[in-house]
Amino acid sequence: MAPAQQSRVLRCCSCHIFQAHQVKKSLKWTCKACGEKQSFVRAYGEGSGADCRRHVQKLNLLQGQVSELSLRSVEEAVNGSEEENAGPLQAEAGSQQAPSKPLESRWLKYLDKGCEDQELDRGRPALKTQLSTSAERPSSPAQPRKRKWNQRTGQPAHSLHGQGVDSVEDNFEHQDSTGLFGTEQQGTSPALSTANHTRELGFPRWKLPSPVTQVNAPSSKWARFLLAPGNSPQVDEKPSPLQEATMLADLAQGTVENKTPVEGHFSRAPAIRPPQAIHTTTPQLDRPDRKTREQPRDMGTPRADGRPLAQGTQKAPPLQLHNLFTTGEDFDDDL
């Protein structure tokens, strides 16, 4: 009879399960549970196949019991640590809750009921005063205790909310009217300013144009050849301070020459002639090609300022100052 084949008990390195395998020449074997290929390292038993299988069952049972014991020990250790950590916390919480009740009534033991009632009565008005002061504090910034006096006027300063809209408008209109009257009083002759006053003051005060700020500009030698305010398209505007200064300087130097009436035109009265309507001319007698002022003009043609003669008879416009520009000659710089 052939001898029975020998078997050996092996243990997988990955799943740690005991199993029986037949003895082979090669040292390589494969796990029956997880299929892991591995080499022979240690044999836990050798014998017949039946004996090796019974031995494998015993080893696996022992391994299962050991793993269960280890898991139980681990769980017990974790539960014990949690209980140990929770024990002092619960003890502290209980110690905090326990003395909280006697703290409220600890000092009340030594006090009489009458004293307690008196203390409660005293505390109520104090609370009322605190509430009243807290209610008054938000409104205190809006109502200061002391009024601030204005150092310039000597009157208490008012806030913008205290002033009415009507008072602000009246002040604004008063400033506009005073500025307008001040600039009108600084104007030229009363004969020319009366017509302008009547036209400008015909508008309501709140629609009047704001007074133009006068700039002290240096006088220029070409300012005398500029248009007069009467010849400009805006007849109601007053002459600029620059033109007034140049005209007054010409009057002071005595370089003014009276303009003779041209043939075919009406003559103006010298009494109502404004000072800004007078201009200076330089004598240039050596040039024969210059157009003289005595040349006759057509009666039906309009004037140089763009208005017909019929309107000129109704109202005398101021004298023209730009006649030098019609000569067609260059100006001399030594004026």
From Swiss-Prot:
<dbReference type="InterPro" id="IPR032739">
    <property type="entry name" value="MRNIP"/>
</dbReference>
<feature type="region of interest" description="Disordered">
    <location>
        <begin position="75"/>
        <end position="102"/>
    </location>
</feature>
<dbReference type="GO" id="GO:0006281">
    <property type="term" value="P:DNA repair"/>
</dbReference>
<dbReference type="GO" id="GO:0030870">
    <property type="term" value="C:Mre11 complex"/>
</dbReference>
<keyword id="KW-0227">DNA damage</keyword>
<feature type="short sequence motif" description="Nuclear localization signal (NLS)">
    <location>
        <begin position="145"/>
        <end position="148"/>
    </location>
</feature>
<dbReference type="GO" id="GO:0071168">
    <property type="term" value="P:protein localization to chromatin"/>
</dbReference>
<dbReference type="GO" id="GO:0005654">
    <property type="term" value="C:nucleoplasm"/>
</dbReference>
<feature type="compositionally biased region" description="Polar residues">
    <location>
        <begin position="129"/>
        <end position="142"/>
    </location>
</feature>
<comment type="function">
    <text>Plays a role in the cellular response to DNA damage and the maintenance of genome stability through its association with the MRN damage-sensing complex. Promotes chromatin loading and activity of the MRN complex to facilitate subsequent ATM-mediated DNA damage response signaling and DNA repair.</text>
</comment>
<dbReference type="GO" id="GO:0045860">
    <property type="term" value="P:positive regulation of protein kinase activity"/>
</dbReference>
<dbReference type="GO" id="GO:0005634">
    <property type="term" value="C:nucleus"/>
</dbReference>
<dbReference type="GO" id="GO:0007095">
    <property type="term" value="P:mitotic G2 DNA damage checkpoint signaling"/>
</dbReference>
<feature type="region of interest" description="Disordered">
    <location>
        <begin position="273"/>
        <end position="335"/>
    </location>
</feature>
<protein>
    <recommendedName>
        <fullName>MRN complex-interacting protein</fullName>
    </recommendedName>
</protein>
<dbReference type="GO" id="GO:0010212">
    <property type="term" value="P:response to ionizing radiation"/>
</dbReference>
<dbReference type="Pfam" id="PF15749">
    <property type="entry name" value="MRNIP"/>
</dbReference>
<feature type="compositionally biased region" description="Polar residues">
    <location>
        <begin position="177"/>
        <end position="194"/>
    </location>
</feature>
<feature type="modified residue" description="Phosphoserine">
    <location>
        <position position="100"/>
    </location>
</feature>
<dbReference type="InterPro" id="IPR049472">
    <property type="entry name" value="MRNIP_N"/>
</dbReference>
<keyword id="KW-0597">Phosphoprotein</keyword>
<feature type="compositionally biased region" description="Basic and acidic residues">
    <location>
        <begin position="286"/>
        <end position="297"/>
    </location>
</feature>
<comment type="subunit">
    <text>Associates with the MRE11-RAD50-NBN (MRN) damage-sensing complex; this association is constitutive. Interacts with MRE11. Interacts with NBN. Interacts with RAD50.</text>
</comment>
<comment type="similarity">
    <text>Belongs to the MRNIP family.</text>
</comment>
<feature type="region of interest" description="Necessary for the association with the MRN complex">
    <location>
        <begin position="203"/>
        <end position="230"/>
    </location>
</feature>
<feature type="region of interest" description="Disordered">
    <location>
        <begin position="118"/>
        <end position="194"/>
    </location>
</feature>
<dbReference type="GO" id="GO:0006974">
    <property type="term" value="P:DNA damage response"/>
</dbReference>
<dbReference type="GO" id="GO:1905168">
    <property type="term" value="P:positive regulation of double-strand break repair via homologous recombination"/>
</dbReference>
<keyword id="KW-0234">DNA repair</keyword>
<keyword id="KW-0539">Nucleus</keyword>
<dbReference type="GO" id="GO:0003682">
    <property type="term" value="F:chromatin binding"/>
</dbReference>
<dbReference type="GO" id="GO:2001032">
    <property type="term" value="P:regulation of double-strand break repair via nonhomologous end joining"/>
</dbReference>
